[in-house]
Amino acid sequence: MDIKRTILIVALAIVSYVMVLKWNQDYGQAALPTQNVASSTTTSGLPDTATGNNAAASDDIPRAASDTSAPAETPVAASKDLIQIKTDVLDLSIDPQGGDVAQLTLPLYPRRQDRPDVPFQLFDNGGERTYLAQSGLIGTNGPDANPAGRPIYSSEKKTYQLADGQDKLVVDLKFSKDGVNYIKRFTLKRGLYDVTVTYLIDNQSAQPWSGSMFAQLKRDASADPSSTTATGTATYLGAALWTSSEPYKKVSMKDMDKAQLKETVTGGWVAWLQHYFVTAWVAPKGENNIVQTRKDSKGNYIIGYTGPSLTAAPGAKVETSAVLYAGPKSQAVLKELSPGLELTVDYGILWFIAQPIFWLLQHIHSIVGNWGWSIIFLTMLIKGIFFPLSAASYKSMARMRAVAPKLAALKEQHGDDRQKMSQAMMELYKKEKINPLGGCLPILVQMPVFLSLYWVLLESVEMRQAPFMLWITDLSIKDPFFILPIIMGATMFIQQRLNPTPPDPMQAKVMKMMPIIFTFFFLWFPAGLVLYWVVNNCLSIAQQWYITRKIEAATKKAEA
C-alpha cells in the first residue's frame, strides 16, 4: 500500500503542474506576429456591420443588413490634435475624426512598480500598437458611413479635466451636415472607469433621417503588455461577448482567423480581455443588436455590435447611447455594469472554489490591510476547517510509524515474495485498524484549493503589484530571489521526516526527491501562492508533531 501512496503523491504533483500548463493552453493566447497597422495620424478604421446603402470609408466600418455593397478602401488622414479628457481614474484622448477613443491610460495603475509615475496604457493608436474603442452612426444617413470619410467633430476646448469637488464631466463633440446636427457626448464620473457615449441627433432638414449606432473594439495582434513571462503564467488575451445562451463566450484571435461570428442578441456586451484589465462596450438593456467579430485587411481584430435602426422625422430629435468600460477586472464593478461581465475575471474550471476564496481574501484584507497577511490568515482558516480530517490522517500516519518494526519483520520474513508480503501487510493493517491511504486525504483535499488559489492570485487585479514585506514587493509574480520556494522545499523535507519511512528502498528514494521536484515547480509560481504553501506546510508540521506526540504518549501509557 506504500507504493500506492507514493504513486498518488507523485501523480498529484504532476497533475497539478500539467493542469496549470493545460489551463494556459485554454486560457492563454499566444501573441501573434505584430502587424503593420495604421497609426492615429493615418487611417482610423471601423467594423463591418453597417446599415444603409453607402459604402464605408474603410473595410472595418460596419454595414447595415440591407447594405450589399463592399466597403470602399478610402484612406483618410485623422486629426493630429487629439482632445484630452482627464478624471481621477482615466486619462483619455479622443480623435476628432470619428470621435474614437484613441489613447487611454490608468493613472492609479503604474505600468511598472519601479516607475509609479508612468501609468498603464490600455488604448494606444500611436503607431507601434493599434488598440482603440470606436463608435459611430451608420446606415442610410449615418455620417460614419460616408465614403468621403468619417465626420470631423469640433469641441469648445482641447483639454477637459474633472475639477476638485466635481463629480461629473460632460464633453460634447459637434458636427453638422445636410441640415442635421450631431452631438457625440462623453459623460465621465469621479472614481468610475465607465464612460457613457451618447449620440444626440437633431434633424433640421426637410428629409427624414435614419441610421444605427455601432460600437466596437479594434486591436492588433501585439502581445499583452500586462502579462507576466514566468513559466505557466500566461493568461487569456482575446475577445469575449455575452449571448442569451452563453453569459460568457470567448472568441480568440485564432477563432477570428478562421471565421467571422455574427449573432443577434438583446442587450449584452462585447469585450477585449487581457491580464488584469478589460475593455468593453455595454449595449442598452432590451435593445436588439447584431454582434460581430472579424479581421480587417490590416490584420486588426474587431469585436463590436450594431444597434437597431433609428429614425427622426424632419424637425425631430432622437438619441442613442452605449457604455464604454476601460479599466481593471473588478468583479463587483463589472457585475453591476452588466450581467456576465464579471466572468471576464476568469478563474478557470475551479471557479466555484476560487470565488469563495477570493471573497474570503477580500474580507480578511479589509481588516488587516495587507494581501500577504491576508493569505497567511486565509491559510490558517483553511487549516482550521480541515483540521478534523488532518487529525485523522496524522493519527493514521502515527500508527504507521508505530508498526514500522513489524512491517520490517514481515519484509524479512517473506523476502521477495510480493504477494505474500502484501497479504501479510493487509492483515497487519486490519489488525491495527490502520488506513494505509489515510495520509493522502489532506493532499487530495488541498490540491483543488491550491489550484484555485493559484488562479485567484493570477487573475485578480487586486494582487497586481501588491507588496507583502521585505523582499516580496509583488505577490502576483515569482519570488525574485527564490527564497520562498527554497523555504517551501525545506518545510516539505521536515514534514517528510515526520512521516513513516516506506519499507521499499526505491519508494524511499522517490519520496526523498519530492521536495526537490516541488521546489523546482514552485520557483516560477506567484510569490503569494508559495507563501500559502509555506504557511500551510508549517501549520501541517505543527499539527502533525502535536498529534504524533500525543498518540505516542497515549501508547506508552497504555503499555505501562
From Swiss-Prot:
Alphabetical keyword list: Cell inner membrane, Cell membrane, Chaperone, Membrane, Protein transport, Transmembrane, Transmembrane helix, Transport
Compositionally biased intervals (Polar residues): 38-56
Keyword check for Zinc-finger: no
One GO MF term: membrane insertase activity
Any one GO biological process: protein transport
InterPro entries recorded: Membr_insert_YidC (IPR019998), Membr_insert_YidC_N (IPR028053), YidC/ALB3/OXA1/COX18 (IPR001708), YidC/Oxa/ALB_C (IPR028055), YidC_ALB_C (IPR047196), YidC_periplasmic_sf (IPR038221)
Region (Disordered) residue spans: 38-76
Transmembrane stretches, start-end: 7-27, 367-387, 437-457, 468-488, 515-535
Pfam families named among the record's database cross-references: 60KD_IMP (PF02096), YidC_periplas (PF14849)
Family classification: Belongs to the OXA1/ALB3/YidC family. Type 1 subfamily.
NCBIfam families: PRK01318.1-3, PRK01318.1-4, yidC_nterm, yidC_oxa1_cterm
Protein name: Membrane protein insertase YidC
Origin species: Pseudomonas fluorescens (strain Pf0-1)
Lineage: Bacteria, Pseudomonadati, Pseudomonadota, Gammaproteobacteria, Pseudomonadales
